[in-house]
UniProtKB/Swiss-Prot annotation:
Key words of the record: Amidation, G-protein coupled receptor impairing toxin, Mast cell degranulation, Membrane, Secreted, Target cell membrane, Target membrane, Toxin
GO molecular function: toxin activity
Cystines in this chain: none
Annotated organism of origin: Parapolybia indica (Lesser paper wasp)
Protein name, per record: Parapolybia-mastoparan
Superkingdom of the source species: Eukaryota
Amino acid sequence: INWKKMAATALKMI
């Protein structure tokens, strides 16, 4: 699991 990628995706979703 990539935290950096997850954070970027979450920020884009919001």
